[in-house]
Amino acid sequence: MYLNNNIFYSGDKMKKEFFKINNIPAVLWGETSEKIIIAVHGNMSHKENVPIKILAETGSQKNYQILSFDLPEHGERKNEKTLCKVQECVKELSLIIEYAKLHWKEIYIFGNSIGAYFSLLAFKNENISNAFFLSPVVDMERIIKNMMLWFDVSEEKLEKEKTILTPIGQNLYWDYYSYVKENPITSWNISTYILYGEKDNLCEKNIVMNFAEKFNCNILISNGSEHWFHTENDLKILKNWFEKIL
């Protein structure tokens, strides 16, 4: 079910269409094109965040449209009952790309942080022209195990309690952890470009570099940047990167 809501032009004259894809709030940026970039935001973010806006501004100049949407518990969906668990997000990304296949000839993807991880799972067998990843999570099991170590949570305890709230506000879920362990990233045949911050304290450099080497990705390391690209210099680097790879 695809529901159209409204179309308007933002202050920078960019066309934005707000609608829903199977009740998932979405935004389509830019003028009609045969090329679409599906943009998957990161944790604690939303479908109109700054990296996606920069992507839309840059991409529209090169004849791309951008399709972004809110993950569960994010943006317009903060009060929904659906949780932002990996298994739910993979299902939703599958719905999004099926919609894209109906409307565009060339499909590209942009994934930010955990959005890249969900993309790796959901799109691995899809016909994607290129993937663009910013601060990508490529080994979720490692990140969850690190959190369990930090907060003294054993596998046995997590299995028994099913859900554990951590001091940083992030829940640990047994079913999430189990899904991650059962679905490692073992194949990825899509031409991929990565922008990674040298000071990223969430995604360890050696893990990202090993991923890039294993799957023959083009990687650019931003020396002064952290996991969250947000400073004026970070965003300038991001914009320049988009201009170069699109």
Task: Go through each PLM region and give its residues.
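N-terminal cap/lid segment of alpha/beta-hydrolase-fold proteins
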Residues: L3-T32
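Short beta-strand element of the alpha/beta-hydrolase
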Residues: E34-G42
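The alpha/beta-hydrolase serine catalytic core
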Residues: N127-N210, K214-L246
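Conserved alpha/beta-hydrolase
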Residues: A56-K78
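Gly/Ala-rich beta-loop-alpha elbow adjacent to hydrolase catalytic centers
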Residues: G111-S119
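Short beta-strand immediately N-terminal to the catalytic nucleophile in serine-hydrolase-like folds
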Residues: I109-G111, L134
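The serine-hydrolase catalytic nucleophile loop
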Residues: M44-A56, N206
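Catalytic nucleophile-loop/oxyanion-hole region of alpha/beta-hydrolase
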Residues: H74-H103
